[in-house]
Amino acid sequence: MRIAILGWGSLIWDPRDLPREGVWQVGGPVLPIEFSRVSRDCRLTAVVDFEHGMEVPTRYVLSPRVDIDDAIADLRIREDTVKRHIAFLNLQSNSDSAASNAHHRRACEVVRTWLGPMDFLGVVWTALPSNFRSETGEDFSVDAAIEYLNGLPCSAKQNALRYIRNAPVEVDTPLRRKLDELRLL
């Protein structure tokens, strides 16, 4: 079974030990993405966010795995997360992660439509939710995100901005545009 891995952030420019075949391809499903998740090291990371995200094309790469559970495990290890934060679709068994990952139900629908004409029987992607409010006490907005970034110590702020700067050019979100306009990227 051919399995695709979807990416839109550091997975592309810093895949680390993620097993994959070939290079990242443009033409993945269009998903609403925004830098609305605060990571452990204070970066704002790009996540699927149906409330604040901008529809952007994602990328994909072939997994060397033939079993969807192995591809899920690979991505889970790379992302240093739990299994429920890895979404999947398996056309061979007609199963997906929508039931176990309610906030990604709509993403499953979008990815299923994209998968239709593709030469893959499965796909996996990171399904971390936005946590901006729980981490900062503020609802996510471009202004709140900039305020958050400006409140970081210098080295943490530079690391956070580097993450946004290194994202693929097509990940053109409102926050990224504003940071570019302010010449912070």
Where do the protein language model's features map onto the residues?
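A glycine-rich, hydrophobic/aromatic-adjacent loop/helix-cap motif
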Residues: 1-185
